[in-house]
Every structure is written in structure tokens, then in C-alpha cells.
Amino acid sequence: MIDKKNITIGIVAGEVSGDILGAGLIRALKIQYPQARFIGIAGKNMLAEGCKTLVDMEEIAVMGLVEVIKYLPRLLKIRRLVIDTMLAEKPDIFIGIDAPDFNLDIELKLKKQGIKTLHYVSPSVWAWRQKRIVKIAQATNLVLAFLPFEKAFYDRFNVPCRFVGHTMADIIDLQPDRQDACFQLNLEPKHRYVAILVGSREAEVQFLTPPFLQTAQLIKQRFPDVQFLVPLVNEKRRKQFEQIKAQIAPHLEVVFLDGQARQAMIVAEASLLASGTASLECMLCKSPMVVGYKMKPFTYFLAKRLVKTKYISLPNLLADDMLVPEMIQEDCTAEKLAEKLSVYLEQTESGIKNRQHLIQQFTQLHQLIRCNADKQAAQAVIDLLNDEV
């Protein structure tokens, strides 16, 4: 058993969802290693658990193939800083959380220097750029996956992988308490709400806010009693959203929330959101949703030719079925989004029945990935530290 007092763990998260996963993992590891040091790149959740960060996490949270090129010099400089720091610190293990294009190169270099490496959250190799499996095998001692079909993919290539479930599936109740969520947000439970979630990245807010606000205007015309909840991850994203709103929909009333996306989804009769981890969270909150996504045309041109899956949203990928509408690029228009969203808001008998059936399907998927992920992930780290993988 490794010395519990002097353990150092390198850990890098690249965006908000990874920061949440990292915080849960750190909490679980501190049960076994209460004196452990954590150093790397952290967001507010990991910082709250005592992780030291080398740079602001948002500096590496860029999206899209084209957008990365713009920030490449800075990204490379930060990556070099992480590698140099880790080689100097010589952590007992390095954990890269998601952000594969950033983390895998770090893991590869550290593993070559004899540092154990673990990648938490499988890159979407099953969806696109499948040849990355070779690099993943070279860069990591172990991959942790939160989707069952991901482990099956790794098993085909004999790459060590554990399915650990997803921490959000553990945290969120199978039957979320809407009354309590309304209380937390100081909202009237008898009112009708739609949640609008434009994403956590600058580019997502830029591309999705206009069509999402225009959708809200159309929904308001058709359902005047509906109120809109807009959770934003930080002050930067709120200012960005407000600037766009002033041009697109200055008179549309919305309730701004400081984070609190989960409570908003639980309260909402339906949600309009970006693809990504938010779609999984929305499913776990049992909120019927429409997924919209837009990016720069050239980024989309490249992505369309690289992606190998039928779906982009996690509920649909988990179910291997089109449970929720996906409106991508040219389909991500106010008219089309409003049409799909309206289905969930109709108070007809068939509408209510369809909604109940969807929530039942969401619950089944919730149970599938509810595995006490923090504990499972921490145990995987401990096993790797003790050469039991």
C-alpha cells in the first residue's frame, strides 16, 4: 500500500463538467488519502476541495476544430507548463479528466517518464477519430468510462477500461423533487417554466443564444403563461448573454439564475439546451428536452465528415434511439426549435401521455448509469496506485 501521507496527485479538468467530476473524485480519494496533495488545472468545484490550479480552467475550455487553432499558442504554452510542473512534482499518478485533445499528450509524455496515468471520461472514440484508440492505449494505464457501451468498445481493442457510471446519476434522485427545486429558486410551483441553457463555453453562448431567444419569443406567443429560466455558469457568460439579448429580444422577460441549472431543469416543464453533458443532466432531472447545436460552418463541415454516430446527445446515445429531438446547424432555427418544444408544452391527453412515457424512459437510463461513480472512480485510482489494475 502506497504511503498515505505523502501522496501527490496531478489532475487536470478542461471545462465545467470535468470540474464537477474532479471534485467528486477528490472527495472520494481523500477518504483513503486524507493528506493527499492535488495539483493541476481546476475549476471552482475542485478548488473548493483543495486542488491547486496552475491557470484559470477557462483558458483551456475552447470548443470546435477551428476555434482551437485561434488559441493554439496559448494552449500549447499551458500544456507545456503542466508537463514541466508534473515532471518536477513527480506525482504518484496523473488524472486527465475529459479534454482529450489537451490531456492525452500530457498523459503520453508523463507515462513515458514512468508516471502512472489515468484518463477519466472516455474520449468519444466510438463516435469519431477512432484511430485515437492507439494513442489512448499508449498514453494511459487505465480509462474510466461513464457509459456502458464505451467499455465494450475498449474491450474490443484490449485497452484497460472500467465502467464507473456517472456521478450526476448518483447525486440526482430518481424522482427529483420539483417543490424543493422551486423553493431553492424562490419560484412559484404553480407556474409553468421552460429552461434555456446555452452552454458553458464562449462560442456556445455566441452561436446558440440568438436562435434560443428567438425560440423563446415564439413559445411566449403560443403559451403566454410560460416563464423562462436562464441559468448561466458565471458572470462572463451572463454579460455575454445579456449583450446578445439586448439586440435579439430586449423585451423578453427571463429569470436569470446564478448556475443552478439542475434546479431549473427539475422545475422546467421542458428544456432547450446545447448538446453535451447538459443533455445527460437534463435526462436525469426528468425534463423533456430539445437539443440544439450550432458552430462555425467550416467546423461543422469537418465534424459532419468525422462523426460516426447516429446521434449527438447523450440520452439518444445511451438509448440508441431518438428519444429527444436534435436540431443541428441549419435545423437549429427558432421555428424548428419552437415546433419541437411545443410538443412538450401542449396540455392535451396525448401530449401528457407522451411526456410521461419519455420520463419513464429517462428513469430507466438513469438506473443504468447509477453506480456510485465517485467511489468506483476513486477505487480505480487506488487500484492503479497499488498496481492492482
From Swiss-Prot:
The keyword Cell wall biogenesis/degradation belongs to this UniProt entry's keyword annotation: no
UniProt keyword annotation of Glycosyltransferase present: yes
Keywords for the protein's UniProt record, in alphabetical order: Glycosyltransferase, Lipid A biosynthesis, Lipid biosynthesis, Lipid metabolism, Transferase
One of the GO BP terms on file: lipid A biosynthetic process
GO cellular component: membrane
Record field: catalytic activity: a lipid X + a UDP-2-N,3-O-bis[(3R)-3-hydroxyacyl]-alpha-D-glucosamine = a lipid A disaccharide + UDP + H(+)
One MF term in the entry's GO annotations: phospholipid binding
Pathway entry: Bacterial outer membrane biogenesis; LPS lipid A biosynthesis
EC number: 2.4.1.182
Domain of life: Bacteria
Family: Belongs to the LpxB family.
NCBIfam families documented for this protein: lpxB (TIGR00215)
Role description: Condensation of UDP-2,3-diacylglucosamine and 2,3-diacylglucosamine-1-phosphate to form lipid A disaccharide, a precursor of lipid A, a phosphorylated glycolipid that anchors the lipopolysaccharide to the outer membrane of the cell.
Listed name of the protein: Lipid-A-disaccharide synthase
Lineage: Bacteria, Pseudomonadati, Pseudomonadota, Gammaproteobacteria, Pasteurellales
